[in-house]
């Protein structure tokens, strides 16, 4: 039996849990607390599972899969001519205007070519829903297109087994009504969730008892709040959205596809509260038309249903004209005579006028009160008298709230925020752990401390210090160091898929995916030929389904005949619950296996290459769970603490593995993006002004990664345009926009969809780090330098491939400029680009040169057999590159290559004696196929073969230890050099000499060949003590 004081005291014990959540990256989800019981006893046996206590508090958390079918929008051009039949030229001569194309929403199955725009738009809207976060909302996890039915979408969300509907059924069986204060708490939490949704410009529209779930702590979780928004207010589906019992009168009057405002949810809340109080819905009936008539009757309309205040029931009656008062009549006449208002808007306003009559609703509420009072006095009544507590069992304030919710006219009905400010809810706000009790001053003050610190006693200070220490550990017990975290629904779903979960298979296994007969896949609208129109229509017993017959006859030669079939798809609110016990068990095992100390030690060993324990992380779910836990800690510190302390740790952990579920947050932290500063900068840019590159953006965006569902959606185009425009306006002094910036911005937009400030700030930081020298009005010199470095690196690692490219005259300028000017974003799909950028963001800015070299080396066997034309064609195959191998090879090449090969070695205003540091004309440097290195790389690596091509006399006077004196003019030099092939070779040559010899080694296909910049002169200047000098004068 439910306690009567549950609604008041139910949340009071959760304050400490909420404090634990204050220090976690995620605020809502599955809570995990783990702590070492023997930590205070200095027990160093951290690998003993018996020393760790792990608790997974799921509160009944489940994942639900909700399939629904959508429709595509088909536009039919009404061209003059023979469409579906013959036409005469005279029939069009009297045409006043060319008919406009008409759009119809149709099922995919009847269309030969699959239409994807509806899918893309639905997926883009789903990303907005997945960004919502509230304690009383079930998390919207994802919307995924079905792999089996291209007109079906699968909604994945947080869910629970218990609901208000089931709770009422349980209370009815026990003959125990839900207490008044519990109903009040339900109303408060539902209103909190609705208020949050409405503040995000979202309408639930489908609020009902079965969509209001209860977790194991009896806290409200609203579900299925995204369908109305996903379906473009019902336009993309062939079924009406919403439970008829709780549908507002204005929604009924505007039709199934009419857009509902947020106050429709307030009406639904009033209906639900009344349902809970009575224990049943008083206007419920198996006939939908009767239900709508009863609701409209209570809203002031004259219908075939009326409420008998004596029998306290609805009954059939004759339809009478709706009575309106004199003021309403004047408004009615005003709208009816106004020619400036459209017919649709005029009809809507007239309907709203009729909703101003509250008499029926007031009589209805008062009758229910009187009935309950009479029943209580006589201790008798209807069979439903013991199911609900009744209106008289509620306080006056809660009854007032219900009455305000059920005001027929939405203009007079209060919104959710206004209702939430009702004095009745103050009691619940005071004990609400999520209610912000004060404004934090200063910004860095602890959430645990009160606003006034002057009057704190020593005991209070110690108590707050104790809470703070618990928070840092996550609320563990026993005083031991704890590892606590909260995993969001998206992360739980990610773990479930790593464990082999598949939503399509889950639906099949549980009987939710059933094969439909082919007739059920017929489209709602099909174009038919005129010769078939008569025979088709003659077989129909119903009137013409599309427009009036005379209208259709009038335009029969201007557009195709449209036959509307019966709605083949009816909304099914069934959903498939996914069992997650295996996921929770794996989380417990992971926390026991990898405590923080054990994990830190593992990282150190992995970085030192002493342990292979952390290899193959992609297939190791235990490690991924812990890595995400550690990232949660670091990302929280980065956002709310000192980012300079957490950023290096994020770097180190990201080198181990970047979880796809956190990639956007990790990238922005690596790039040094601060959320508050990003919003300030982005909001300071006036995007309303006309920009110099707006036209170019409009041309580029529709061609940018249009295979990607988010980037090809309408919302994706809008957001990408705004981000590019913001960057352009911020960089007006550069005076140019380089095509390809849209490709660079795309990955950041994908990971920060509906968060334009962070996407923009990430783009800005990325461009500043990797592309600042290229995105300038004159970037010829910078591009030429990059091309030369790339060519020299290719010669260093694969001279045979470079020689062949030079032989067929396939210059890097012909194929690789888009690689570098977009950091490969132009040529690679987003999924491969993400893997590439995971490494690029963690390494020096020279890594793209190595990636470019490794990318083309991957196709070397094919390229070596090609001529120029085939080679150009081959470059179009680069997107098929194995990106994992490319990154691995690039990092291997990077580690084998002297660092100074990619570093500029010239300094302006250099002393003439330091000739090797003076700038060399680029045309002269272009002749060098090899890279140059500095003396630091020569000294630090003793494994190099050093070839000194100075004269024997010069070599005898002074030379570098272990160097070999070689005569570059020997006739059998190539045979002599073969013994050094495959080793790192450094050439020491006199000033202005050695280029031909070093180039010759490259042409002989010697890899790892470089020249010491400055030769012996640089060694005498910087490493004189290391040289061997002859004693002879």
Swiss-Prot record:
Pfam families: Pkinase (PF00069), RabGAP-TBC (PF00566), Rhodanese (PF00581). Signal peptide: none annotated. Residues 548-558 have a biased composition (Basic residues). Residues 657-844 form the Rab-GAP TBC domain. Residues 1-21, 35-55, 81-101, 535-560 are annotated as: Disordered. ATP binds at residues 78-86, 113. Gene3D superfamilies: putative rabgap domain of human tbc1 domain family member 14 like domains, Rhodanese-like domain, Transferase(Phosphotransferase) domain 1, Ypt/Rab-GAP domain of gyp1p, domain 3. Residues 72-425 form the Protein kinase domain. Residues 535-546 have a biased composition (Polar residues). Residues 36-52, 81-97 have a biased composition (Low complexity). Keywords: ATP-binding, Nucleotide-binding. PANTHER family: GTPASE ACTIVATING PROTEIN AND CENTROSOME-ASSOCIATED, ISOFORM B, RAB GTPASE-ACTIVATING PROTEIN 1-LIKE. Belongs to the protein kinase superfamily. Ser/Thr protein kinase family. The protein kinase domain is predicted to be catalytically inactive. This is TBC domain-containing protein kinase-like protein. It comes from Dictyostelium discoideum (Social amoeba).
